[in-house]
Amino acid sequence: MVKSFYGYVRDAWKNPDETYVNELRWERLQVWRKQGSVTRIERPTRIDRARSLGYKAKQGIVVVRVNVRRGGLGHVRPNRGRRTQKMGKNKVSGGMSIQRIAEVRADRRYPNLEVLNSYWVGEDGKHKWFEVILVDPHHPVIKSDKNLNWVCDPSSRGRATRGKTSAGRKGRGMATRGKGTEKTRPSIRAYKSRGK
């Protein structure tokens, strides 16, 4: 079977440090650092990944690039008396992943659009960059698209903020089932955040 163009692009992005993507990324990051936190772009950087997540080159679909800080929640060690359990040094779980933060920021910048999905495009020592696919639920082209018109339903409002995207479901523990996930359903909050 003949591999498609998208297959070659996907292979190049699997190991970006070892392929031509590394040189392109070095040039791109210099430009991206000077741009704002949420930047609308003309076309996706990773066309294979965007299309697999639902992107189509048609009216009503917008792609934005978002940069977010890197790293976990650094916690300063208390210098006064504490119980070891209350120091919070061993593990501080973030409420949202870096990718979810990027999706929510894009959602707030474009309140009339809904987040479809997002994917990683680059990182340096300080920031991570994600591209977020946004859909206009009121656009007639989207309403007539049989693959995307589910976004027009009122139940799909605020997908990013409610954790209904792919990254959001993963962060809420909905990506796994069975043994070991007892504290993630019906929700993280219902189990007093013990599922994090």
From Swiss-Prot:
Presence of the UniProt keyword Ribosomal protein in the record: yes
Keyword set, alphabetical order: Ribonucleoprotein, Ribosomal protein
Pfam families from the UniProt entry: Ribosomal_L15e
PROSITE patterns, sorted: RIBOSOMAL_L15E (PS01194)
Compositional bias of kind Basic residues: 159-172
One GO biological process term: cytoplasmic translation
One GO term describing the cellular component: cytosolic large ribosomal subunit
Region (Disordered): 153-196
InterPro entries: Rbsml_eL15_core_dom_sf, Ribosomal_eL15, Ribosomal_eL15_arc, Ribosomal_eL15_CS, Ribosomal_uL23/eL15/eS24_sf
Molecular function (Gene Ontology), one example: structural constituent of ribosome
The family this protein is said to belong to: Belongs to the eukaryotic ribosomal protein eL15 family.
Matches recorded under NCBIfam families: PRK04243.1
PANTHER family in the record: LARGE RIBOSOMAL SUBUNIT PROTEIN EL15 (PTHR11847:SF4), RIBOSOMAL PROTEIN L15 (PTHR11847)
Protein name: Large ribosomal subunit protein eL15
Gene name of this polypeptide: rpl15e
